[in-house]
Amino acid sequence: AKVTEKSWQPQTTSTKRWKKRKTPSQPRSRGKVRKIYKKVKRPLHVCSRKKYSPKVITTSRRQKRARRANKFETIP
């Protein structure tokens, strides 16, 4: 009996799906102050979660500088 070798093909569809799932979409805040969560190391076997809640730090976004008109404009 002949043994036919199947040409090995990588499963591209499943890997593509996995890659898409692995990268989460970043929440984009429009015109709001972003909240950055500081990672707090919690001690083991502690039930009270209120005590060790992640610290929320609000950072003000830098405003883009508006282009100012040149004081000394060249006369055509």
Swiss-Prot record:
Region described as Disordered: spans on this chain: 1-34, 56-76
DNA-binding found in the keyword field: yes
GO terms for MF: DNA binding
Gene Ontology BP, a term: cell differentiation
Compartments (UniProt record): Nucleus; Chromosome
Basic residues biased stretches: 16-34
Polar residues bias (residue ranges): 1-11
Example of a GO cellular component annotation carried by this entry: nucleus
Disulfide bonds: none
Record keywords: Chromosome, Developmental protein, Differentiation, DNA-binding, Nucleosome core, Nucleus, Spermatogenesis
Major site of localization recorded for this protein: nucleus
Entry function: Involved in nuclear basic protein transition: histones are replaced by spermatid specific proteins which are themselves replaced by protamines in late spermatids.
Descriptive protein name: Spermatid nuclear transition protein 3
Species per Swiss-Prot/TrEMBL record: Sus scrofa
